[in-house]
A protein has these predicted regions:
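Active-site beta-strand->loop->alpha-helix modules in alpha/beta enzyme cores, enriched
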Residues: 1-14, 18-138, 199-202, 206
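The feature marks non-catalytic terminal segments
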Residues: 2, 103, 138-215
């Protein structure tokens, strides 16, 4: 069994990590790993003019933080009035990510797949990928339902058995109740079941291994 000491998961928005890799993170934490979560937008909630209020947005991701026992680290990418982050692939964001990655000796970093059809996800991948010039650990791309496998095929090469964590994963995603429907929760569980069949277990999360360094 592979053992990880320090793991960094990077999502474009609060909820992305819960969707894509929270089962694996909970499993690795139980095995003793230190886990950090970085969100590419900043921590100011959207203005009240958009669909969800500040209070709702804050309470949702704070509930997820409490369940995970991890305080999210937010980057400095402000939100527009419609609630979307100004998230660009540029030197400023790459330098921010450089500093975040330098905080620990990470042996596993997880982020979005460039095949996601959400532009914020694609730019988050680009920022992380650009900051791994000297990184020598493993780099995984997560499958973030419902945004995955649209721009290019997601080809999973790593499967993590999350059978013991699937209900907690659903509870984490349910923290974002203002915009995740019961149908989406059902589909997330179905996807985990489909990936589990590939591993001959009940539920699994799938990842694409971008690279692995053996020292």
């Amino acid at each position: 069994m592979t053992s990880y000491k320090n793991i960094l998961a990077v999502g474009a928005h609060p909820d992305d990590i819960e969707l894509g890799c929270s089962g694996a993170l909970m499993k690795f934490m139980e095995q003793g790993a230190n886990v950090d979560i970085v969100i590419a937008r900043d921590d100011n909630a959207p203005k009240p003019s958009v669909q969800r209020s500040r209070e709702t947005t804050l309470s949702e991701y704070q509930a997820s933080q409490e369940m995970l026992g991890i305080e999210f680290v937010f980057m400095n990418n402000p939100l527009t009035d419609d609630g979307r982050p100004i998230l660009e692939w540029n030197n400023t964001n790459i330098e921010q990510m450089d500093r975040l990655i330098a905080r620990r000796d990470y042996d596993l970093i997880i982020t979005h797949s460039p095949g996601d059809h959400h532009n914020d996800h694609v730019n988050t991948y680009r920022i992380v990928n650009s900051s791994l010039r000297r990184y020598q650990g493993e780099f995984w791309l997560m499958e973030c339902c419902p945004y995955a496998n649209k721009n290019q095929e997601f080809v999973p090469t790593v499967f993590v058995d999350i059978s013991d964590y699937i209900e907690d994963k659903i509870k984490l995603v349910s923290c974002y109740g203002s915009y995740f429907t019961d149908t989406l929760l059902h589909n997330i569980k179905n996807l985990a079941g489909y990936r589990g069949q590939m591993l001959n277990v009940e539920y699994a999360e799938a990842f694409e291994l971008r690279w692995k360094t053996i020292r």
